[in-house]
Amino acid sequence: MTLSHAVAGLSAFLLVAGVQAAEYHFSFDVPYGQYERQFKMKTPGDGSLSCTVMIEKEYRGEKWVPAVILAAAEDDAEDDTLFLSSSTEPNGGPRTFHLRTFNQAKPIIDKALWEAPDEKGVYKMAVSWYANGAIGYQYGVYASWQEKQFVEKPGFATRHVSIHASGVKGTAFCYVHAK
């Protein structure tokens, strides 16, 4: 069985189960100091957005950290948002996963979640949203995931998810599952 057959089979199963599934592929090349949205989707019901990211090149400078960012937000300005990001230190340092949340543009949570050796720029991140308001997040390097964690009461309802890139060149393969 090929990967495309497996994906088609899984998509058919999810459709029968009342789950919508979609696959997206992005290539990005965002210069240092710039921030670009690669994808945005409204979030009806419960669902998840998961991405495998492959970084080819990082553009570094004094002020900005090169990163790919997943966001779960209530408003278009993303003043009420959870951001899950990953970046590396210059000169081959470890990969760090970082969580930040904002309510009315004020920072609420800002913490490093996990550090791991960088696996040639390949890593995974996911956010999930729930009708009860909770937001889940998960991350990993190469083929393994860390345990899913939650912000039970973020102070806002997720109305859309988005993917952003800043100071990086690479690709992302993403899957959206929604009920």
What are these regions (language model features)?
Residues A22-H98:
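Secretory/extracellular carbohydrate-interaction modules
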Residues K42-D46, A116-K120, Y130:
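Surface-exposed coil/turn segments at beta-strand junctions on protein surfaces, enriched
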Residues A8-L14:
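Bacterial N-terminal signal peptides
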Residues R100-A126, Q146:
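Short, aromatic/His-centered strand-loop micro-motif at the edge of beta-sheets
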Residues K148-C174:
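Flexible glycan-contacting loops in extracellular carbohydrate-active proteins
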Residues M1-A8:
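Bacterial N-terminal signal peptides that target proteins for export
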Residues V16-V19:
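N-terminal signal peptide c-region/cleavage motif recognized by signal peptidases
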Residues G121-Y139:
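Short tryptophan-centered beta-strand motifs in secreted/extracellular beta-sheet-rich domains
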